[in-house]
A protein has these predicted regions:
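C-terminal PAP-associated
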Residues: 1-176
Length: 176
Protein backbone atom coordinates (compact mmCIF):
# COMPACT_ATOMS: atom_id res chain seq x y z
CA UNK A 1 0.00 0.00 0.00
CA UNK A 2 1.48 3.34 -1.03
CA UNK A 3 -0.58 5.49 1.36
CA UNK A 4 1.30 4.82 4.58
CA UNK A 5 4.74 6.06 5.49
CA UNK A 6 7.22 3.24 5.07
CA UNK A 7 10.97 2.79 5.00
CA UNK A 8 10.60 -0.49 3.07
CA UNK A 9 10.51 -1.04 -0.67
CA UNK A 10 6.98 -1.96 -1.73
CA UNK A 11 5.88 -3.81 -4.84
CA UNK A 12 2.78 -2.75 -6.73
CA UNK A 13 1.12 -5.06 -9.25
CA UNK A 14 -0.41 -3.33 -12.28
CA UNK A 15 -1.66 -4.51 -15.68
CA UNK A 16 1.73 -3.38 -17.05
CA UNK A 17 3.69 -5.48 -14.55
CA UNK A 18 5.08 -5.30 -11.04
CA UNK A 19 6.78 -2.08 -10.02
CA UNK A 20 9.05 -1.39 -7.06
CA UNK A 21 8.17 1.73 -5.07
CA UNK A 22 11.10 3.12 -3.12
CA UNK A 23 10.80 3.88 0.56
CA UNK A 24 9.42 7.16 1.87
CA UNK A 25 11.83 9.56 3.46
CA UNK A 26 11.61 13.08 4.76
CA UNK A 27 13.75 15.48 2.80
CA UNK A 28 13.89 17.75 5.85
CA UNK A 29 13.61 15.73 9.05
CA UNK A 30 10.78 16.93 11.25
CA UNK A 31 8.12 15.35 13.40
CA UNK A 32 5.60 18.19 13.72
CA UNK A 33 4.76 18.69 10.03
CA UNK A 34 3.66 16.55 7.12
CA UNK A 35 5.43 16.77 3.75
CA UNK A 36 3.55 16.01 0.54
CA UNK A 37 3.94 16.76 -3.17
CA UNK A 38 7.72 16.84 -2.82
CA UNK A 39 9.40 17.53 -6.17
CA UNK A 40 13.20 17.62 -6.21
CA UNK A 41 15.19 19.19 -9.03
CA UNK A 42 18.92 19.31 -9.76
CA UNK A 43 21.01 22.36 -10.66
CA UNK A 44 21.73 22.27 -14.42
CA UNK A 45 25.49 22.84 -14.06
CA UNK A 46 26.28 21.56 -10.54
CA UNK A 47 24.81 18.14 -9.80
CA UNK A 48 25.55 18.47 -6.08
CA UNK A 49 22.98 21.26 -5.74
CA UNK A 50 19.33 20.21 -5.55
CA UNK A 51 16.22 22.16 -4.62
CA UNK A 52 13.15 20.48 -3.17
CA UNK A 53 9.82 21.78 -2.03
CA UNK A 54 6.76 20.36 -0.33
CA UNK A 55 3.32 21.11 0.96
CA UNK A 56 3.64 21.13 4.73
CA UNK A 57 0.93 21.04 7.33
CA UNK A 58 1.37 21.43 11.06
CA UNK A 59 -0.13 18.30 12.62
CA UNK A 60 0.01 19.67 16.16
CA UNK A 61 -0.83 23.11 17.46
CA UNK A 62 -1.77 25.68 14.84
CA UNK A 63 -3.20 24.56 11.53
CA UNK A 64 -0.64 26.27 9.31
CA UNK A 65 -0.47 25.14 5.69
CA UNK A 66 2.67 26.26 3.92
CA UNK A 67 5.16 25.63 1.16
CA UNK A 68 8.50 24.38 2.37
CA UNK A 69 11.84 24.81 0.59
CA UNK A 70 14.88 22.59 1.09
CA UNK A 71 18.31 22.50 -0.52
CA UNK A 72 21.37 20.32 -0.60
CA UNK A 73 24.84 21.24 -1.84
CA UNK A 74 26.37 17.78 -1.33
CA UNK A 75 24.30 15.68 -3.72
CA UNK A 76 21.54 14.91 -1.22
CA UNK A 77 23.61 13.62 1.70
CA UNK A 78 22.41 16.49 3.91
CA UNK A 79 19.50 18.90 3.50
CA UNK A 80 18.68 22.28 5.03
CA UNK A 81 15.72 24.60 4.73
CA UNK A 82 12.44 25.50 6.31
CA UNK A 83 9.03 23.88 6.55
CA UNK A 84 7.38 27.32 6.56
CA UNK A 85 9.14 29.37 3.89
CA UNK A 86 6.08 30.76 2.14
CA UNK A 87 2.58 30.85 3.64
CA UNK A 88 0.11 29.96 0.91
CA UNK A 89 -2.14 27.20 -0.42
CA UNK A 90 0.70 24.94 -1.59
CA UNK A 91 1.30 23.02 -4.82
CA UNK A 92 5.00 23.90 -5.01
CA UNK A 93 6.84 23.64 -8.33
CA UNK A 94 10.58 24.32 -7.96
CA UNK A 95 12.98 25.40 -10.71
CA UNK A 96 16.69 26.23 -10.92
CA UNK A 97 17.91 28.47 -13.73
CA UNK A 98 21.34 28.00 -15.33
CA UNK A 99 22.39 31.16 -13.45
CA UNK A 100 21.71 29.41 -10.14
CA UNK A 101 18.57 31.40 -9.34
CA UNK A 102 15.95 29.31 -7.52
CA UNK A 103 12.33 29.88 -8.48
CA UNK A 104 9.18 28.31 -7.13
CA UNK A 105 5.60 28.61 -8.33
CA UNK A 106 2.67 27.90 -6.03
CA UNK A 107 -0.93 28.76 -5.24
CA UNK A 108 -0.85 32.07 -3.36
CA UNK A 109 -2.77 32.75 -0.16
CA UNK A 110 -5.48 34.38 -2.31
CA UNK A 111 -5.81 31.26 -4.50
CA UNK A 112 -4.03 32.80 -7.49
CA UNK A 113 -0.95 31.38 -9.19
CA UNK A 114 2.28 33.06 -8.17
CA UNK A 115 6.00 32.62 -7.75
CA UNK A 116 8.98 33.74 -5.71
CA UNK A 117 12.70 33.61 -6.40
CA UNK A 118 15.96 33.38 -4.48
CA UNK A 119 19.43 34.45 -5.57
CA UNK A 120 21.21 32.92 -2.56
CA UNK A 121 20.32 29.19 -2.74
CA UNK A 122 17.05 29.68 -0.89
CA UNK A 123 18.32 31.58 2.15
CA UNK A 124 16.06 34.54 1.35
CA UNK A 125 13.09 34.87 -1.00
CA UNK A 126 11.45 37.63 -3.00
CA UNK A 127 7.89 38.63 -2.34
CA UNK A 128 5.03 36.99 -4.19
CA UNK A 129 4.83 37.70 -7.91
CA UNK A 130 1.22 37.01 -8.97
CA UNK A 131 0.75 35.74 -12.53
CA UNK A 132 -1.24 38.13 -14.75
CA UNK A 133 -4.76 36.86 -15.43
CA UNK A 134 -4.69 34.32 -12.63
CA UNK A 135 -7.94 34.14 -10.66
CA UNK A 136 -8.65 32.94 -7.14
CA UNK A 137 -9.35 29.48 -8.59
CA UNK A 138 -5.93 28.49 -9.98
CA UNK A 139 -4.60 24.98 -9.36
CA UNK A 140 -2.43 22.08 -10.55
CA UNK A 141 0.67 23.99 -11.60
CA UNK A 142 3.80 22.52 -13.18
CA UNK A 143 6.92 24.58 -13.84
CA UNK A 144 10.11 24.10 -15.84
CA UNK A 145 13.06 26.02 -17.26
CA UNK A 146 14.24 25.82 -20.88
CA UNK A 147 17.69 24.36 -20.29
CA UNK A 148 18.75 23.91 -23.92
CA UNK A 149 21.61 26.37 -24.44
CA UNK A 150 20.98 26.58 -28.21
CA UNK A 151 17.30 27.38 -27.74
CA UNK A 152 16.01 30.83 -28.62
CA UNK A 153 14.27 30.75 -25.22
CA UNK A 154 17.19 29.42 -23.16
CA UNK A 155 16.68 30.24 -19.49
CA UNK A 156 12.99 31.10 -19.86
CA UNK A 157 10.82 29.74 -17.06
CA UNK A 158 7.39 28.31 -17.81
CA UNK A 159 4.44 27.46 -15.61
CA UNK A 160 1.27 25.76 -16.77
CA UNK A 161 -1.77 25.51 -14.53
CA UNK A 162 -5.49 24.91 -14.60
CA UNK A 163 -7.80 27.87 -14.24
CA UNK A 164 -11.21 27.07 -12.73
CA UNK A 165 -12.76 30.56 -13.02
CA UNK A 166 -12.60 33.75 -15.05
CA UNK A 167 -11.94 34.06 -18.78
CA UNK A 168 -10.02 30.77 -18.90
CA UNK A 169 -12.47 28.58 -16.97
CA UNK A 170 -11.51 24.90 -17.15
CA UNK A 171 -8.55 25.60 -19.41
CA UNK A 172 -4.86 25.00 -19.01
CA UNK A 173 -3.04 28.34 -18.93
CA UNK A 174 0.64 28.89 -19.72
CA UNK A 175 2.77 31.76 -18.49
CA UNK A 176 6.46 32.63 -18.63
Amino acid sequence: DNKDFSTDVRYVSTPQGIFAVGPNFRVHPTTARTQSETPIIRHPTNSNIMFASANTYNVGGTTTFSTACYKTTDGGVTWSGSDTTVFNFGDPAPMIMHTGRFLISYITSTGQMGASYSTDLGSTWSGVITFPGSTTSSDKNLSAVDGISTSTYYGRCYTVYTEFAGAYTNRIVSTY
